[in-house]
Amino acid sequence: MCTVVTLIALASSLLATTSARAEAPAATTKMSTVDAQVVLNAYQGLVEEHLSGVLHSIRAVAVSSEAKSANWERTKPMLDRLSKDLETDAAVWYAMPDGTYFSTDAEGLTEKNLSDRSYFPRLMSGKDVEGDLVLSKSTGHRSVVVATPVMADGKVVAAIGVSLRLRLISQFVEKNTQMPANMYFYSMNADALISTHRNIDRMFKHPTDIGDESLGPAFATSLKAERGKLDYELNGKKISAIFQKSKALDWHFFIARQSD
């Protein structure tokens, strides 16, 4: 986390310098690649560190005797504490192998089932889940899932998961990066579904839902690359962006800047 904080401090300093340049008569209107890269690294680091921290926390709970008991009443106090400690107001759940699950939001057994979630077979095969996008069955919020299996005697007996609100993650990034008005961040999964965005109304949309159809192929090409640059027009305004892929989440992170 120290590295991320350092990057944010550097980003703030560089962004302040960029703003000062913008007021000078000889200022350029193009994105500074160096400045944008620092901000991109800070943005990606903030999100990855937050989600990996959640994963670390639920793994610690998953190895407890309470979690291994597959008993909600025994496990509930630990999950309640975890839910209250999370900065992004998340729903913590405790799932059984048949997909039924308990939630801290519901304060017990829910009427929903997780077995139809695309990540659930992976979870039941003993693998962690990090970065899957869902509309939470517990809350209805646009969320990212972080989950881990609970193993006992070599078998998966339960799973602990957290559905984090993407709106609050975006606000968390906004608060900690303090970008200028003409610069913004966004990320998307492999299907070009927007996961976080400075403009919260654009989350859980595809680029073609925001602009014209020409954005589809442009972003599809970008999502095949590990990193790169992308220039496009949105609502008549020219946008320059740089991006890079997160191996941890299988998301692409973008920093974009609108030309004057």
Language model features with spans:
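Membrane-interface helix-start motif
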Residues: P25-A27, Q171-K175, S259-D260
